[in-house]
């Protein structure tokens, strides 16, 4: 007779050890946790201990035991009832089925609920089949919607029915884990071919990882709209919170979180070697090497490593350009070096450190060009659904869309309604009632979809005594407002109030800067026990006596507001400020901005910060971009007050093929100095802008409904495909540009293909006028339900913006594409033809 399985037999010892360490460090918090664990079964208690052992301190402070109990009980039930789950390697089960956190989202109970909703749909399925089915359920419940940076909990995404890609993937991972399918979120932290990033989901089955698009179901695994885009990435990573690291290349840490390199599953890769030498030309051991891509006109890190005893660091990456920097501190002095490397052509590079204060010594201040190459389109995942699978998937997705749209139609958060509709029973509550809509109004759209009435009630009740002491706008925004940054909205005012005596409260009101002194004494930072982007709430900081620097700054604002002092984090640099004599003053003395940089725009370029230019300061061996606010050029001039030091200006021109023409300007500015620099954007030649992208076959229809292959339409020479949205300004604009150059376009009319939804579109004024002037243009029809998205994604332009214009040269070979409103597209098309 086989011995009964023992839950987490291989990891039991280290779980207990790590749990005890956490409890030792935070005894006040863990005492009630230990009491509640005594009431759990042995398996559930051990599962809870695993969660507590490897969660960030912020989770320990922010959430009650009952939240994690939901995850533990569901995980144990899956292990007991599902043989597939019980057969998983323990590390896979712990990290990717049991664990509560996916990335930086708010944590809320969801697993038991999701399992109840999904369980019957996957009865008898293996992990592969279950993953595909769960993703259809996810599509029925949520879809993409651009929102702010705060990451919703999985249950909030489910309730409101949408989220950005990071939230969709958090939701999908939780849904998969709820029914025992091992799952994780993976990220392209920054694309190389466009200014953006993306997150999706991987599932583990048959001993391997496979991927899928969150809430974007397909009939097969390893298929998503991002398949081609991911082949052009320089890095794709996953993360693990456990200290026992699975196999894989570690590419950096974020506090307690380890980042793993997953790129080989998506792109053609190679290993590169960086050698760092000190000022004497000797190997620099333990130098920090940052691998960066140019994105949003700044160098953004995608991986970080330390050099070995030979001064070398190695990275597996894609075939494109990386900006590589190295830094090292010796005897209190920082040293720095940087270069740009094209990994397609180079295997190795060498960096020689110099003191950062001498970074610009001996260099003339002038623009230096840098060519940044995106990896070529080279998908390694080429599986495609059969026509039958595709038809089945389209039908199921259409049904999912109908279900979701019915679900979210007219949906609103009932907690908001409950808060607004609370009965006013006493005269003094009438004042509070007048501020209910003001409180909701100061919250973000996202806040209003997941806020809780009881939380808002406490903030309202305990702030009302101060309402007559300042202007209403100030009171609402900087005292009543429960939101400080991107923290989880929770109660904290009552807990803060009882923490101080009446005399202490008055002393802090009289001198709010003393609040920070108290915080610095009482709250310690343990970055090695945190995830930098996960904030400890004000109440969590007080409970655990720990918090990151950002968490402590949020606590300052929370205490000030609780005491009736208007306070905020400065929207540009997140510095703490409180109101004094009608204006905000800083809590910490800022470094004096004792220099002036005068930037000249020139005549031809419209400069947009973090689109085609940025400026960064070199400090502690690292360039950090300045967070400019609404500063605009006036009469082609921008005056920037700066601190003295070394700076780097970047300008970038993103080409249609994904490459970038960059310009760098390094300079030093001294105290009291005024320096003038003219921004310069590098121009591109036509041949630099083109690509050769193989487009998938697709069908268009003639007026009588006959289907025509796109391969036949594009077979000979160059063609212009134009998917038009009649009577909308972007389409009207390109049609007008073509008519303004009627004679030039007439010579190519037979090579121009207009695609519209219906014959009625041809009768609209501008389109009918264009067809009358350019008589030989070909007309075809499509419903725009699928082809637009497929072609837009394939050509790396926004598929949600029309018109979609593609220039081909040969059968299904796309050489140029654009979408939406773009001035000068007509001229570009003529150049290309």
Model-based region annotation:
Residues 799-820:
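A short, hydrophobic beta-strand/beta-hairpin element that forms part of a small beta-sheet core
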Residues 311-325, 329-331, 340-343, 632-657, ...:
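Short Pro-Gly-centered beta-turn/loop motif in secreted/extracellular proteins
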Residues 768-802:
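Short, internal strand/loop/helix patches
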């Amino acid at each position: 007779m086989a011995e009964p399985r023992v839950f987490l037999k291989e990891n039991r010892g280290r779980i207990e050890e790590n749990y005890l360490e956490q409890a030792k460090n935070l005894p006040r918090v863990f005492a009630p946790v230990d009491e509640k664990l005594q009431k759990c079964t042995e398996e559930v208690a051990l599962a809870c201990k695993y969660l507590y052992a490897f969660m960030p301190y912020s989770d320990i402070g922010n959430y009650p035991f009952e939240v994690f109990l939901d995850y533990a009980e569901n995980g144990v039930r899956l292990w007991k009832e599902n043989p597939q789950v019980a057969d998983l390697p323990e590390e896979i089960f712990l990290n990717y089925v049991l664990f509560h956190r996916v990335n930086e989202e708010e944590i809320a109970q969801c697993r038991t609920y999701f399992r109840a909703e999904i369980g019957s749909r996957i009865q008898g399925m293996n992990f592969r089949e279950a993953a595909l089915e769960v993703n259809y359920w996810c599509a029925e419940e949520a879809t993409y919607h651009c929102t702010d940076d705060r990451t919703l909990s999985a249950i909030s995404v489910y309730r409101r029915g949408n989220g950005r890609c990071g939230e969709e993937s958090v939701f999908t991972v939780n849904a998969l884990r709820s029914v025992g399918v091992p799952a994780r979120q993976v990220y392209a932290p920054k694309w190389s071919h466009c200014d953006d990033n993306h997150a999706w989901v991987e599932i583990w089955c048959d001993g391997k990882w496979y991927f899928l698009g969150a809430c974007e179901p397909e009939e097969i695994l390893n298929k998503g709209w991002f398949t081609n885009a991911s082949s052009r990435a320089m890095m794709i990573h996953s993360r693990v919170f456990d200290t026992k690291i699975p196999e894989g290349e570690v590419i950096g840490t974020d506090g307690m979180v380890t980042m793993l390199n997953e790129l080989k599953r998506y792109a053609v890769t190679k290993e590169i070697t960086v050698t760092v030498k000190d000022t004497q030309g000797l190997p620099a051991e333990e130098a920090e090497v940052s691998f960066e891509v140019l994105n949003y006109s700044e160098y953004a890190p995608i991986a970080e490593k330390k050099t070995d005893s030979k001064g070398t660091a190695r990275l597996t990456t894609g075939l494109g350009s990386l900006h590589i920097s190295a830094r090292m501190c010796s005897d209190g002095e920082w040293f720095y070096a940087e270069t740009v490397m094209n990994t397609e052509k180079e295997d190795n590079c060498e960096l020689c450190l110099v003191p950062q204060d001498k970074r610009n010594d001996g260099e003339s201040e002038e623009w230096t060009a840098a060519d940044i190459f995106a990896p070529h389109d080279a998908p390694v995942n080429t599986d495609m659904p059969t026509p039958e699978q595709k038809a089945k998937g389209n039908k199921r997705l259409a049904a999912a869309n109908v279900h979701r749209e019915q679900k979210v139609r007219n949906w609103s958060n009932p907690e908001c309604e409950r808060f607004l509709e609370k009965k006013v029973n006493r005269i003094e509550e009438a004042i509070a009632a007048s501020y209910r809509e003001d409180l909701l109004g100061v919250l973000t759209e996202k806040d209003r979809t997941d806020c809780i009435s009881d939380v808002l009630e406490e903030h309202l009740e305990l702030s009302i005594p101060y309402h007559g002491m300042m202007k209403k706008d100030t009171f609402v925004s900087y005292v009543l407002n429960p939101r400080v940054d991107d923290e989880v909205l929770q109660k904290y005012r009552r807990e803060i109030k009882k923490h101080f005596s009446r005399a202490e409260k008055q002393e802090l009101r009289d001198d709010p800067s003393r609040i920070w002194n108290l915080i610095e004494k009482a709250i310690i930072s343990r970055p090695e026990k945190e995830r930098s982007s996960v904030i400890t709430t004000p109440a969590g900081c007080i409970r655990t006596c720990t918090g990151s620097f950002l968490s402590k700054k949020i606590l300052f604002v929370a205490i000030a507001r609780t005491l009736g002092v208007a306070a905020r984090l400065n929207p540009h640099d997140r510095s703490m400020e409180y109101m004094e004599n009608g204006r905000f003053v800083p809590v910490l003395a800022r470094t004096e901005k004792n220099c002036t940089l005068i930037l000249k725009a020139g005549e031809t370029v419209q400069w947009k910060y973090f689109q085609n230019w940025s400026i960064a300061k070199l400090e502690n061996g690292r360039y950090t971009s300045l967070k400019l606010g609404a500063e605009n050029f006036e009469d082609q001039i921008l005056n920037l007050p700066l601190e003295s030091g070394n700076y780097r200006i970047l300008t970038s021109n993103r080409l249609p093929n994904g490459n970038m023409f960059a310009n760098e300007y390094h300079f030093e500015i001294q105290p009291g100095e005024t320096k003038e620099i003219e921004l310069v954007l590098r121009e591109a030649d036509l041949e630099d802008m083109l690509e050769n992208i193989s487009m998938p076959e697709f069908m268009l229809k003639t007026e009588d409904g006959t289907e025509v292959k796109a391969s036949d339409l594009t077979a000979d020479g160059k063609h212009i495909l134009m998917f038009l949205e009649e009577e909308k300004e972007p389409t009207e604009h390109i049609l007008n540009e073509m008519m303004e150059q009627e004679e030039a376009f007439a010579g190519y009319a037979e090579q121009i293909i207009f695609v519209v939804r219906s014959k009625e579109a041809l009768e609209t004024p501008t389109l009918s006028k264009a067809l009358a002037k350019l008589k030989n243009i070909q007309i075809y029809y499509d419903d725009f339900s699928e082809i637009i998205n497929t072609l837009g994604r394939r050509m790396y332009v926004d598929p949600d913006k029309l018109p979609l214009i593609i220039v081909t040269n040969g059968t299904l070979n796309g050489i140029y594409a654009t979408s939406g409103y773009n001035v000068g597209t007509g001229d570009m098309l003529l150049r290309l033809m």
